Amino acid sequence: MRITNTLTGKKEEFVPIQPGVVRMYVCGPTVYDLIHVGNARPAVVFDVFRRYLEYRGYRVIMVQNFTDIDDKIINKANQLGVDYKTVADTFIAEYWRDAHALGIRPANFHPRTTDFVDDIVEIIERLVEKGVAYQTETGVYFDVRKFEKYGELSKKKIEDLIAGARVEVDETKKFPLDFSLWKKAKPGEPCWKSPWGEGRPGWHIECTVMSVKILGESFDIHAGGEDLVFPHHENEKAQAEALTGKVFARYWMHNGMVRFLGDKMSKSTGNIFTVREAVKRYGRDGLRYMILSKHYRSPMDFSEELLQDYSRAVKRVWEILGRYEKSGDIGIPKRNAVYEEYVNRFVEALDDDFNTPVAVSLIFELARNLSKAMDDNDREDALLYYHLIRREFGPVLGLFDLNEEKKEVSSEELLKLLIEVRDVLRKEKRYDLSDRIRDHLREIGIILKDTPSGTEYTVE
Ligand SMILES: Nc1ncnc2c1ncn2[C@@H]1O[C@H](COP(=O)(O)OP(=O)(O)OP(=O)(O)O)[C@@H](O)[C@H]1O
Ligand SMILES: [Zn+2]
């Protein structure tokens, strides 16, 4: 299997440190708002990448953090008049709702920064002892000029980095690119004790510490959006390698940016489309299909019309699958030459730098074949195509997955049925029963709203 490694800029054969096991760290969200379609891209891409590694027989140990303390979280807390923890807890819960709706499997570990403050302090102390970090009045900083390989990941010279990038401004630093490991608290800010006074960890050190503590000093894959290459990943790498003297992550994988209205989709710019809205309007398979039909490293332009097109294409496949399920056999087909050929094409595509566009196009090809086989009343072939879509490839791509998708469809259908029954009850003035339905739904977070054009529902 070959993947493009940002560290070398080349497509390389993937060989894990421990045979058969892949240790992988993905930078997770800073939790101060709902996730948007841009954030959904790494979530879906690396979820499917992990499923594929498992499909190929690896055991995967995956870590995805939550950044639960940061300036943006503190600002949001101040805006809302609550403490930072309420903001973090709220948006972690919201993250889970969206991730679940999007069919993202939880990683094996979801560490939160604030649970690792003791480890972070200990590692910063070791960096200070090694002479690669120093203290000023405002905090503790990493001394970039002490780490020779700085710039290796982002492939930039130090001079260019200073000129081109946004660097943390602080009068007390020795060098513009030095970045904070520990920020001393201003009055009223959340803080933890440390040898340098009360304060909080910088953003980059948390990922270094959580990855090294959970996965070890060297691990296989470090992933995230390409906006993180500099400074975040360059800094994570510098801290870890200055600390241990070993290679930190051996392969770095970065997804391209989702653009919306001409810019990177971003909470800070405000040009966002939330995952919640996208899934509600166009279904989770529509969004997953849109994301997977672009190669993960290419930029991706988002528009609602495009998402709608993908959602329609997905519906057509569902219709074909539904037609088959009404009458067809859903047993296990024979693994014949055609079966093998499809598996080979699937593996060949995904082994080649995780080419999901080719893999999803196979699903659509199979759906067309299935439709034709039904027209021709060719039962054996139909079962084969059906099986390949729903049991062989579906679970890897998280699309048309037999076990998962059924539940989603049926809960929506059931809700529609309940609303219909309630309408009948109201027309017959049996308000005791109709109110009971409304109240009970409200208790489980489904709010009904009666409008002149019918009853609508929202999920809280
Ligand atoms: N537009 C985008 N396209 C693709 N990936 C993105 C996009 N925006 C963020 N990501 C990725 O989503 C993950 C979580 O991002 P994070 O919560 O740190 O902030 P963010 O959404 O980029 O914040 P902001 O929107 O304020 O820039 C990271 O891996 C990041 O690279
Ligand atoms: Zn990170």
Curated annotation (Swiss-Prot):
GO terms for molecular function: ATP binding; cysteine-tRNA ligase activity; zinc ion binding. Its EC number is 6.1.1.16. Pfam families: DALR_2, tRNA-synt_1e. It is found in: Cytoplasm. ATP binds at K267. A motif ('KMSKS' region) lies at residues 264-268. Its main location: cytoplasm. The keyword Protein biosynthesis applies. Binds 1 zinc ion per subunit. InterPro entries: Cys-tRNA-ligase, Cys-tRNA-synt_Ia_DALR, Cys-tRNA/MSH_ligase, Rossmann-like_a/b/a_fold, tRNA-synt_1_cat_dom, tRNAsynth_Ia_anticodon-bd. Gene3D superfamilies: Cysteine-tRNA ligase, C-terminal anti-codon recognition domain (1.20.120.1910), HUPs (3.40.50.620). It comes from the Bacteria. Zn(2+) binds at C27, C207, H232, E236. Keywords: Aminoacyl-tRNA synthetase, ATP-binding, Cytoplasm, Ligase, Metal-binding, Nucleotide-binding, Protein biosynthesis, Zinc. The keyword GTP-binding does not apply. PANTHER family: CYSTEINE--TRNA LIGASE, CYTOPLASMIC, CYSTEINYL-TRNA SYNTHETASE. This is Cysteine--tRNA ligase. The gene is cysS.
